[in-house]
From Swiss-Prot:
This is Cyanate hydratase. Disulfide bonds: none annotated. HAMAP family: Cyanate_hydrat. The active site is at R103, E106, S129. Keywords: Lyase. CDD domains: Cyanase_C, HTH_XRE. One of its GO terms (molecular function) is DNA binding. The keyword Cell division does not apply. The keyword Disulfide bond does not apply. The gene is CYN1. Catalyzes the reaction of cyanate with bicarbonate to produce ammonia and carbon dioxide. It comes from Ajellomyces capsulatus (strain G186AR / H82 / ATCC MYA-2454 / RMSCC 2432). Pfam families: Cyanate_lyase. One of its GO terms (biological process) is cyanate metabolic process.
Length: 163
């Protein structure tokens, strides 16, 4: 048996996720595919691909076609499940209970004002877009063999307008 880390889903633990999540995660588990492999097949970033699975990102017609192919799901069924618009932001309780998701929340809670201050000094009065946005997760191993998570956020700077 291969030693693969595979994210699966217990839908009973996530009652706010769309129906498509259960279908996508079941096919992912059945095929033993990582988000990296699925993302490579559909031509998207791993995080963007996972966001489709959690109902937090809109799948294009091309995404649906390629997902149906790689996951072995009927195209018509998948098109029906994924053709609507995402209902973003309601999939996780607030504050988050999952330890990893809570750590991400905690980073913003602890460093949010510091991020804001530095960004304001670099860019002026405004905000970083979470719509014109990309993100990626990488793994780094230091000289001592310790693994480090490298999370990159890249958002368009939107200056406040004067009126």
């Amino acid at each position: 048996m291969s030693n693969i880390n595979l994210t699966t889903l217990d839908i009973s633990e996530h009652p706010n996720l769309p129906t498509s999540s259960a279908v996508l995660f079941k096919a992912k588990a059945d095929k033993r595919l990582s988000f990296e492999k699925i993302a490579s097949h559909i031509g998207r970033n791993e995080v963007a691909t996972a966001a489709i699975f959690y109902g937090q990102a809109k799948a294009s017609a091309e995404d649906i076609d390629k997902l149906a192919e790689v996951l072995g799901i009927n195209y018509g069924q998948l098109e029906f499940l994924l053709s609507g618009f995402p209902d973003r932001g309601k999939s996780v309780p607030f504050p988050p209970k999952d330890p990893l998701i809570y750590r991400l929340y905690e980073i913003v809670q602890n460093y949010g004002y510091a991020y804001k201050a530095v960004m304001n000094e670099k860019f002026g009065d405004g905000i970083m877009s979470a719509i014109s946005f990309s993100t990626k997760v990488e793994k780094e191993t230091d000289k001592d063999g310790n693994d480090w998570a490298v999370v990159t956020w890249r958002g368009k700077w939107l200056p406040y307008s004067r009126f």
